[in-house]
């Protein structure tokens, strides 16, 4: 009864007003799955290809009708008749159909839309929530959220170099409390910024995007907001950064325009991070080095890898092959997991499995162009990832993931697990 009878894709809009793909998969039993595909602003060079039309007369060239046609005319024909419960077989079939390293023929957006919709249809067929279907009986850990409350870099039109300044309510006793703490700090931060005469407009991911005197001032106002909300920095709430430093790297030099000394070598940039880690309760830095600066990554891991989580995003692009190379070379100690960087659910699960076996932490992540789809909330619980990064405490495209996690926590009830600071299991205990 789980045979696929129809697959249909359409073009919809994402949270930035750009087109993206939505796919529906129908089964013989009447079960159905629907999935929408996200899109990134700062992307890694080795990410799977997001297929766009390039027709400047339509959606400024960003239409996805080619990807829609690839689903409706090519992929559908091949997967109709297959069992939706054969996730690996279906994903493998699509990879064979595409036949390219970066999914550039059919488009990773086309392939991922089908891959996720198939999983949702199969879950519907067997009467399970998506997290239970993917993860089985042991899927029970709610993730510690990384909440992006100040946006800079490619995610905002301001003068802040670092792309994301995040809070992690690690002192919370459960996910619902972590969410409440995050929301209260978010509102306190708005008040702090207003009091200093700063703009409180928000960026792509719902964080504030003011022009600040320095990157460090962003940390200062966040600390002030944490205290104003009645919490203790370093105890109740930890900080995390996403530097997206590939965007700052050119000709072997990193340029942080908002710093007194903008030009920095890899060593000087690591000094800069070390100073911040000594001064503020920073537990995690993502993409601290450019994706091709493996020497810089190695140095950063050696100097800071016992103290903080060093996350590879553009570095690893959720790709098991690249991750294996990083593990072998002792680079980073954590991987950011983005479904559309690799393009199938199966390959995503392979990357998570490999990371966990190597003692790397995993952070399930959204993209800056999101939709109302909440798959990644379910995925974070399915694999007991321990951490999720899905934006700020406003904008429905971000909050819908948090709300789905509240539902999952309710459903799991007494079985639900929330580990707070213990998610950083691979760091040296202080």
From Swiss-Prot:
Q: State the Gene Ontology terms under molecular function.
A: magnesium ion binding; phosphopyruvate hydratase activity
UniProt-listed SUPFAM superfamilies: Enolase C-terminal domain-like (SSF51604), Enolase N-terminal domain-like (SSF54826)
Q: Which residues form the signal peptide?
A: none
This protein's GO CC annotations: cell surface; extracellular region; phosphopyruvate hydratase complex
Give the binding site residues for Mg(2+).
Answer: 242, 286, 313
Q: Which reaction does it catalyse?
A: (2R)-2-phosphoglycerate = phosphoenolpyruvate + H2O
Name recorded for this polypeptide: Enolase
Q: Does the keyword Cytoplasm apply?
A: yes
| Stored Pfam families | Enolase_C, Enolase_N
Q: Which GO terms describe its biological process?
A: glycolytic process
What is the UniProt remark on how the cofactor binds and its stoichiometry?
Binds a second Mg(2+) ion via substrate during catalysis.
| Enzyme active site | 205, 338
Function in brief? Catalyzes the reversible conversion of 2-phosphoglycerate (2-PG) into phosphoenolpyruvate (PEP). It is essential for the degradation of carbohydrates via glycolysis.
- Locate the residues binding (2R)-2-phosphoglycerate: 163, 338, 367-368, 389
Q: PROSITE patterns given for it?
A: ENOLASE
- Functional pathway: Carbohydrate degradation; glycolysis; pyruvate from D-glyceraldehyde 3-phosphate: step 4/5
For this UniProt record, the keywords arranged alphabetically read as follows:
Cytoplasm, Glycolysis, Lyase, Magnesium, Metal-binding, Secreted
Entry cofactors: Mg(2+)
Similarity section: Belongs to the enolase family.
Q: What EC number(s) has UniProt assigned to this enzyme?
A: 4.2.1.11
**Stored HAMAP family:** Enolase
């Amino acid at each position: 009864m789980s045979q696929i009878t129809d697959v249909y894709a359409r073009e919809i809009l994402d949270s930035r007003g750009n087109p993206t793909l939505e796919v529906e998969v129908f089964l013989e039993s009447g079960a159905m799955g629907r999935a929408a595909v996200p899109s990134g602003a700062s992307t890694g060079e080795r990410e799977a290809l997001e297929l766009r039309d390039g027709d400047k007369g339509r959606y400024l060239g960003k239409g996805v009708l080619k990807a829609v046609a690839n689903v409706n005319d090519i992929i559908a024909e091949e997967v109709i008749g297959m069992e939706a419960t054969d996730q690996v077989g279906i994903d493998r079939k699509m990879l064979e159909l595409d036949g390219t390293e970066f999914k550039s023929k059919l488009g990773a957006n086309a392939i991922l839309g089908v891959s996720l919709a198939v999983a949702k249809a199969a879950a519907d067929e067997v009467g399970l929530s998506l997290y239970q279907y993917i993860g089985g009986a042991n899927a029970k850990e709610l993730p510690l959220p990384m909440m992006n409350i100040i946006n800079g870099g490619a995610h905002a039109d301001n003068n802040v170099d670092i792309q994301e300044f995040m809070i992690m309510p690690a002192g919370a006793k459960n996910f619902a409390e972590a969410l409440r703490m995050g929301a209260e700090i978010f509102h306190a931060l708005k008040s702090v910024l207003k009091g200093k005469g700063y703009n409180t407009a928000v960026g792509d991911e719902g964080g504030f995007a003011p022009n600040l005197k320095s990157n460090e001032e962003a940390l200062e106002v966040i600390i002030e907001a944490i205290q104003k909300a009645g919490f203790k920095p370093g105890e109740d709430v930890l900080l995390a950064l996403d530097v997206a430093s590939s965007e700052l790297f050119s000709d072997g030099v990193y340029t942080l325009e908002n710093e007194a000394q903008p030009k920095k070598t890899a060593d000087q940039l690591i000094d800069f991070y070390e100073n911040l880690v000594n001064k503020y309760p920073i537990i995690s830095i993502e993409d601290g080095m450019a994706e091709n600066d493996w020497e810089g990554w190695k140095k950063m891991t050696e100097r800071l890898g016992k103290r903080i989580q060093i996350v590879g995003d553009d570095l690893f692009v959720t790709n098991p092959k690249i991750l294996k190379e990083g593990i072998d070379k002792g680079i980073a100690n954590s991987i950011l997991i983005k479904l559309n960087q690799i393009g199938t659910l199966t390959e995503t699960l392979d990357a998570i499995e490999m990371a966990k076996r190597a003692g790397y932490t995993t952070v399930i992540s959204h993209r800056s162009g999101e939709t109302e789809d909440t798959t990644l909330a379910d995925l974070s619980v399915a694999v007991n990832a321990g951490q999720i990064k899905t934006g700020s405490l406003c904008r429905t495209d971000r909050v819908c993931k948090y709300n789905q996690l509240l539902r999952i926590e309710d459903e799991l009830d007494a079985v639900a697990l929330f580990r707070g600071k213990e998610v950083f299991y691979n760091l040296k205990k202080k």
